[in-house]
Amino acid sequence: MLKIRNVILVLGVLMSPLASAATQVSIGIGLPHVSIGINLPAYPRLVAVPGYPVYYAPQLEANFFFYDGMYWVYQDDDWYASTWYNGPWGVVGRADVPVFILQIPVRYYRRPPAYFQGWRPDAAPRWGDHWGHDWEQNRSNWDNSNHRAAPAPAPLPAYQRHYSGDRYPRQVEQQHQIQQQKYRYQPHDPVVQQHYQGQGQGQSQGKGQDQGKGQSHGQGQDHNK
């Protein structure tokens, strides 16, 4: 259920046939190597969206959010996700975008696309109108969640503010190692859980390969303070 652009699968661990760029395949979040034209020189200020377990970045000219331990960006009619604020980014298929991301009110999109025009600012985008009948049938309850049952917002990974410029880790493996040491949060959303599990499996496989080689050779509240 991933729309994949030259992406192998979650961190290259789950080896399955790829979908073309025009196909929606539902398996989670793609391998994080996609460049989406966002280059953040430093950790952004994030503010809670009232009533939702989501943060947004009011000072960025981008549709940039944080939810359940990951950053989410909506750009050019696609969703992208990353565990680090400046990527690399993985493509998220429309069938896999978490409900609480889909429900973010229009007013929190800092760079809304033209087709948002005329939509209520205090309501979620009309994804069914935009993405069509088939999508709406598959995600028929996306806008019916009980906000009272919403999980608490995930803690922000504020440790990442110490990694900017040349200090920013570019390799996914390095990012995961730092995250394991600095951020103990466990996600609840199935798509995010799958991504986290893929990271852990990839790390374990990498260590096993290294050992094998060794043997063979011998508007809300500001939460950034």
What are these regions (language model features)?
Residues 1-22, 183-225:
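Classical secretory targeting signals
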Residues 23-192:
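Low-complexity segments
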